[in-house]
Amino acid sequence: MGQKVNPVGLRVGVIRDWESKWYAEKDYADLLHEDIKIREYIENRLKDASVSKIEIERAANRVNITISTAKPGMVIGKGGSEVEALRKALNELTGKRVHINIFEVKQADLDAKLVAENIARQLENRISFRRAMKQAIQRTMRAGAQGIKTQVSGRLGGADIARAEHYSEGTVPLHTLRADIDYGTAEADTTYGKLGVKIWIYRGEVLPTKGKNKKEGGN
């Protein structure tokens, strides 16, 4: 039975960039665990702010964090109060100087993580999984996607036996590395247990840019 690789990880270094941008030798494991702690803390604290992606860069004793969100106002707060409180909390968590940048996601319906979280919230509010998936597909295709595939798995509708249901529209070429496919997951906590949501969105082809400054020839 064919198994699916994470479409984002497969494209890192081809058309996608790393979400943690730093280099380390001996303390690699410590910094990796610190990254995980930072991501978990931000995701828990900003769980209602539609956070799509958290990028972490390091330089000496400084950590630069870029938060991509569909609701920048909620993250920044009145007069920047929320983002300042978050920065202080992360300073204490890491023991390093933390700088936070906020990046606005203009089209939330083309972001797989945000679409998955939206479906998960609807499932928690007892909306039918079929209706939630079909509405998400319609919104994403209207936003300009070339294809979308959705999957919800678990005790659907309170059934005794867990199963997975898929809906898709358009094309999602998982094998084409130049295809810009966004992948996102979310979990819904229902009275019958957890439901898993997976979303694949095909946003068109991206041609890898070749280095313009590379010298050609023997010299």
UniProtKB/Swiss-Prot annotation:
Give the top-rank taxon of the lineage listed in the UniProt record for this protein. Bacteria
The entry's function note states: Binds the lower part of the 30S subunit head. Binds mRNA in the 70S ribosome, positioning it for translation.
Q: Which GO terms describe its cellular component?
A: cytosolic small ribosomal subunit
Which keywords does this Swiss-Prot/TrEMBL entry list?
Ribonucleoprotein, Ribosomal protein, RNA-binding, rRNA-binding
The family annotation for this protein states: Belongs to the universal ribosomal protein uS3 family.
Give me the gene this protein comes from: rpsC
Instruction: Give the quaternary structure.
Output: Part of the 30S ribosomal subunit. Forms a tight complex with proteins S10 and S14.
**What's the protein here called?**
Small ribosomal subunit protein uS3
List residues of the KH type-2 domain: 38-106
A GO molecular-function term, please? mRNA binding
User: Which GO biological process categories is it annotated with?
Assistant: translation
Protein source organism: Halalkalibacterium halodurans (strain ATCC BAA-125 / DSM 18197 / FERM 7344 / JCM 9153 / C-125)
CDD domains registered for this protein in UniProt: KH-II_30S_S3 (cd02412)
Q: Which InterPro entries match?
A: KH_dom, KH_dom-like_a/b, KH_dom_type_2, KH_sf_prok-type, Ribosomal_S3_C_sf, Ribosomal_uS3_bac-typ, Ribosomal_uS3_C, Ribosomal_uS3_CS
